[in-house]
Amino acid sequence: MKRKKFLALAPAGVMTAVTLTACAPLDALYDWFFGGGGSASHGSEKGRVTESEELEKQLEKYFGLSETTASDRAKQTLEAVAKGFDATWLDNNKLNDKAKDALIPITQDKVQAKQALWVDVMELTSPDGTADITLDNRPIYSDRYVDPGPDSGDPYHWVYLVDPSNLRRELDYYKKNDAELYAGTFQKDGKNYAAMVTIMNGWW
């Protein structure tokens, strides 16, 4: 179940994003790939993000989350990712080191101490809009703001690419059903992308 509770953007927030690409209209892609239903649109122009509740439900199932929050900061982070996205961020439709470096300035002013943020982006490549949106065995972007505590050093960002199965294990271990999740689609240079933003608060 998703709580449609939009949180105010804090001085430093957290989030993750997803992108989608195809020749068919987005509504048709949703109906074909996700088995019907609709999407909540938040803008259809190029570079604007359209929320996909179908994809969010798929991610909730993958991560084993019974309840998530759609926050303003997750939405705004996803929009920033979509705006800055470049096709060179993907190798074999997976995020690469160039994507990691480009995402750092987008996410680091949005992550607070003891929060973790994940982003994934993928293109829909086939003419009919189909894509294998399996998260296993693909690197996703991870930004953790580590606070060692008093007399143990300054807070720092720990940024790397990680398999989403690690995120699934952490969400299960820490019982983070209050995670913030936002997923949607955008267009860039004639292509459609799917993207996700996930935020976990208090990861240790």
Regions found by a protein language model. Name each.
Residues 104-204:
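A well-ordered secondary-structure block
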Residues 26:
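Surface-exposed receptor/substrate recognition regions of extracellular proteins
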Residues 17-20:
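Bacterial Sec-type N-terminal signal peptides, specifically the leucine/valine-rich hydrophobic h-region
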